[in-house]
Structure formats: structure tokens, C-alpha cells
Amino acid sequence: NQIGQSNRYDFEKILTQKSQKDIDWFFKTIIDSRDIIDYKFSDVSRTTDSITFSVKNKTGIYAPIPIYGIKKKEVVFKEWIEPKTKDSTYTFSRKNADKIVINYDNEVPEYNQRNNWRSLKHVALNRPIKFNFAKDLEDPDYNQILYLPTVNYNYYDGITPGVRFSNKTILDKPFNFDVNPAYSIKAGTLSGSSAFSWNQYYRNSTLYNVRYSISQNYFHYAPDATYLRLNPMVQFRIREKDFRDNRKQMFLFRQVIVNREASDYITDNSSPNYSIFNARYSNTKTELID
């Protein structure tokens, strides 16, 4: 800057000249595009001395990525690989590792770190389950389940203590569940609610998110009868072509289905069950007000 104002191209030129490897991928992928990097393991096999595995490129964007061998949270080896095809196979010395991890220290800005682990001891469960109280930050080392004690009340169920289990953390996931089993003290039966949702994201489209969900509630509406309410729903979220524009549109379609048991306390049981269709549209824009 003593001679003139430097820019990114000066920085790129210096790095390119000093690097012993081709680093065009860094500027083309990380700097100049919205492309995302996402690798995962497939076809892992191991012996006492070696590990053979394939690395699957989920987005088709190629970049060097480090592979770590971990034993009891200690790094026993680290190897950089440069996948050139959609599925590349490698063999490394095991060095007593009990798991292998892609991008363990997050050195490469990868889109999804939840699929980076592969256990060499437990085939069915790559990441151990960890229970955390209430809301917590994302920890890609574990399959996190959040729990929270709950207490609700209605006249026919009385006090209904329960425990809420969820996998929803701050970062979005494709699949979310929220289950709240409870016990109705007055009725002496189980009750509660649950919700499950699946998200599809479209990175380069104005239709950027489709969300499918279903929720249910099960409680008493009379001393001798329960009701079950089901709520299947689909949402379409749309943004502007200019991604910096905060205007968002949403189309929501849902069906509310209620099934009620017949009750001796209700004089008119001619149509205890019903179903209602609901559609909704919103168009919002969030901006700071001067």
C-alpha cells in the first residue's frame, strides 16, 4: 500500500506465485462463486493395520480436503487428499484410529459437517448420541438430542408432566423432530404431541425451500373420551432473484384432521370427526428503519 492501493488480484498473484500447488480452485470456488463444498465417506473397510474408503463428492465441486484419524479424541494421522472424480478411493495406514473424519478442524469452508464422520468400531452409528438440556449450539461430533421437562394443564387431563425431545439446533437440518410425551394425571393415561418435518433446499433458485411437515396432538376433550388432531402441511418459500433483497413470499397449504372418540357426556355425537383445508399466502420484506 506504500506504492498504491492493493486489491484482491494482487493478493491472488502473490499466493499463486508462492504456492507449490495449483490454487485456482480457491479463487474460483471460495471467492468468486456461491458453489458449496460437501464431501462424505462411503464404502469404508478396515483391517488392524489399514483403512480403505471412498470419498463421495455430493456437490461436484472439487477442492483439497484433509482426512483425520482420531483415537479417543486425539489426532493420530492427518492426510490431505485432492479428489478428482465424484467417488475417489484411498488407502491409509490405520495407526490405531477408531474413527476417520473429513475436515476435522474445519480448515476448508464445507457446507455440511454432519456427514464427515465414520466410526471404525460401530458400523451402524458413526456419531455417538449426546443428550443436551434445552437449546444448544450445533456440535458436529455428536448426534444431539435436546430434552426439556414440560408441564401442561387442561381441565380433562389435569396436570400433564412430560419431557420434550428434539433434534432442532440453531443451524437448519433436512429432518427435524419434536416429540413431547406426557402423562395425564387426572385421566391416568398417556397424552402429548409431536411434530416431524423435512426440508428441501434449492440454492440457486427463487424457490429456495420446500418444507413438508406433520404434527399431532392427543388429549382428552371429555372425561371419558380423547381426540387426535393431525396437521399435515407443506410450505413453499420464495425469494427475489437478487439475493440481497429481503423480500420473501410463502405459500402454505395444510389439512387439519380431528378424530374424536364418542363420549357419554356429549349429547350430540352425530359428527364427532371433521377435516378442514387451509391455504395461506404471505409477502413480507424485512428492512431497517432509519
Language model: regions and residue ranges:
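Structural signature of outer-membrane beta-barrel domains
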Residues: 156, 170, 184-186, 201, ...
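Membrane-embedded beta-strand positions of outer-membrane beta-barrel proteins
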Residues: 149, 177-181, 212-216, 232, ...
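A glycine-rich helix N-cap at a beta->alpha junction
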Residues: 203-218, 234
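Beta-strand-rich binding/interaction modules
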Residues: 23-24, 37-104
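Amphipathic alpha-helical substructures
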Residues: 1-48, 53
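Large, well-folded core regions of big proteins
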Residues: 16, 224, 250-257, 261, ...
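Outer-membrane beta-barrel initiation region
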Residues: 81, 92, 103-206, 244-247, ...
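Non-cytosolic beta-sheet module surface loops
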Residues: 18, 56-59, 153
